[in-house]
Amino acid sequence: MGRKFKVGFIGCGNMGTAMLKGILASGQVDKSQVAAAEKFEAGRKRVEDLGVYVTSDNGELARESDVIFLVVKPYQQEEVLPEIRDNLSVDQIVISVAAGVSISSVEQALMSIDVAGKIKVVRAMPNTPALVGEGMTALSVNANITKEDEEVILSYFNAFGKAEIVPESLMDVVTGVSGSSPAFVYMFIEAMADAAVAEGMTRAQAYKFAAQTVRGSATMVLETGEHPGALKDAVCSPGGTTIEGVCALEDGGLRPTVIDGVRAATQKSRDMSK
């Protein structure tokens, strides 16, 4: 595309920096092809240490980057979009990582005489495990994004976890099943560890056993392609310890409670988007 940078980041807090590190580590782009716009000293220091170009001028970054990641909070994005609007052309991709901000609202904010209705916009929702390279990101794209664009975008987000393109209408569901659910999983790990501590295990060991078991079980689901119920059944011997524990969890309402939690988070996301 003839610009200085393949990738530009506006906003380099914890999430933005984690995404930037993942993309650099993947080897898809050299650090000389990456830029960041950051107005706060702490953020500037973080990205300068990575060896990428840093500016405080959002307009400059937008003008000189092929793909622009907006990793800022919604209220900050309202300020940033007008700053970059007149520096964009129709072959650039703008990726919004602001929670609850729709594609149409980004398009509206970027509307100008030169690029009216032609800007390529992506809405992204990564979750916090992206901070350790194990994120799950939902991506929704507008009508101007090509299949080739999708491949590029997916490759960047796969650098710090996994990514899927979904209809924007499912973004609230993504909030429930992916965005909010790390908190639910942490509660499950904590509860398992509490039980182990109650039975005599040290707290440090209990967290390690519980967390690694969750990680391994999740890997089994992803790598085997087996139904979670089938994997559960394979661990349950007739009259054994596991089926005894499963029955106790069923009696306690584990399934309906988890379902209620995911649906409550989904509904809250819908309510906040109105």
Regions found by a protein language model. Name each.
Residues 34, 61, 77, 202-210, ...:
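Small-residue helix-packing motif on alpha-helices
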Residues 1-56, 60-63, 197-199:
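NAD(P)+-binding Rossmann beta1-loop-alpha1 motif at the extreme N-terminus of oxidoreductases
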Residues 19-20, 84, 192:
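Hydrophobic residues within alpha-helices
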Residues 122, 171-176, 228-233:
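Short pre-catalytic strand/loop immediately N-terminal to key active-site residues, enriched for Gly-Thr
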Residues 105, 109-120, 136-173, 186-223:
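Internal alpha-helical scaffold of NAD(P)-dependent oxidoreductase catalytic cores
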Residues 2, 211-274:
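NAD(P)-dependent Rossmann-like dehydrogenase/reductase catalytic/cofactor-binding core
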Residues 50, 58-70, 74-139:
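Rossmann-like NAD(P)(H) cofactor-binding subdomain of soluble oxidoreductases
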